[in-house]
Regions:
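Short hydrophobic beta-strand element within catalytic cores of glycosyltransferases
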Residues: 245, 249-252
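A charged, aromatic-enriched C-terminal amphipathic alpha-helix characteristic of glycosyltransferases
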Residues: 152, 284-311
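Short alpha-helical donor nucleotide-sugar binding micro-motif in glycosyltransferases
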Residues: 108, 219-224
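Conserved donor-binding/catalytic core segment of Leloir-type glycosyltransferases
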Residues: 154-174, 180-184
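Aromatic "clamp/platform" in nucleotide-sugar-dependent glycosyltransferases that forms part
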Residues: 232
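Active-site proximal beta-strand in glycosyltransferases
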Residues: 59-61, 74-92, 115
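Carbohydrate-associated surface elements
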Residues: 120, 141
């Protein structure tokens, strides 16, 4: 940022600043959610600036550690409502501690309030002694124009149950053990399994589709019956929310934020060996479980973000 850019920014105004390194999809879940949130706010006529904080902009949302913190520090000033959206704990989620969570706590010192994405995330931060300023929980959501159920549900009859799982990250904690077990042990005469995204694994019987942009991903999700959420210690899986948003009940690992996101819209499991029974039960209860799905509407989530940013 040049000095002239900085001086020019002091004279401007937007309704809200967002600090996050945005990427075109396909990309990670936090990026997907923030793209949807920004689009919802813009649809409402709220003016948003990205990675700058003009002199008369009254509020700023900054995301986890995915931005230039030194830039934010330079722009920050008294009188701006600062809200920090926090993921993780990152060390638990990734399976190793590289100091990122400590850095997030340091960055959090600028915040007037902190948004965490699940009760699990809030409680896990507290358990680890990671104190965040004025925390509140707001689940993520999805863009309903893209991730919505199909118009009609055809009865399965004797067809195989179509199971899908997705992941942008190829971290093994995204469910690699579960997928390996399914590839070797599941009855593929009764089930078909699709993985969409990035993986380091080679499968013999699971179909693999590369990373997809949002619309083709949603179309692929709607061509299936059940979503498999096998990631471990995932605070608020956007992949899971996208599957639920497309009307797919979930078979979910009882870990992280999965149970609070799914509720009665799926069946939990603790080990891969339980999945054949879970899939069989979901097949029998498909209509009932689909009807129980609840994803917080994007409009409601945006309202809660705005409330936090305006207090």
């Amino acid at each position: 940022m040049t000095e002239s850019d900085y001086v020019r920014s002091r004279r401007g105004r937007r309704d809200l600043a967002i600090f996050h390194e945005f990427h075109e999809p396909p990309y990670g879940g936090g990026n997907q959610f923030l793209l949807a949130l920004r689009a919802e706010l813009v649809r409402r006529g709220i003016s948003v600036e990205v990675n700058r904080l003009s002199g008369r902009t009254p509020a700023c949302l900054y995301n986890s550690f995915n931005f230039d913190f030194h830039r934010l520090e330079r722009f920050a000033r008294d009188g701006v409502r600062m809200v920090h959206r926090v993921d993780g704990p990152i060390g638990v989620y990734r399976g190793f501690d590289d100091g990122t969570d400590g850095r997030i706590v340091e960055i959090n010192a600028l915040a007037d309030a902190t948004i965490l994405q699940s009760r699990y995330s809030l409680e896990k931060h507290r358990e680890l002694g990671l104190e965040l300023r004025n925390p509140l929980v707001i689940h993520n959501s999805v863009d309903p124009a893209i991730f919505h159920p199909r118009a009609e549900h055809e009865p399965l009859g004797d067809a195989r149950l179509r199971v899908i799982t997705t992941s942008w990250s190829d971290n093994p904690r995204k469910g690699s053990e579960v997928l390996r077990w399914l590839d070797q042990n599941l009855d593929f005469g009764a089930y078909e399994v699709t993985f969409a995204g990035r993986t380091q694994q080679h499968f013999e019987r699971i179909r693999v589709v590369g990373p997809l942009a949002s619309q083709p991903l949603a179309d692929l999700l709607r061509a299936h019956d059940v979503f498999l959420a096998a990631s471990r210690d995932d605070p608020c899986s956007n992949a899971l929310l996208e599957g639920l948003g497309c009307g797919l009940p979930a078979a979910y690992l009882r870990s992280g934020g999965h149970p609070e996101l799914v509720g009665d819209g799926g069946i939990g499991f603790d080990a891969a060996e339980e999945l054949p029974a879970a899939f069989a039960r979901l097949r029998e209860e498909l209509g009932e479980r689909s009807a129980a799905i609840h994803v917080s509407p994007l409009s409601d989530v945006a309202d809660r973000y705005l409330e936090a940013l305006r207090q």
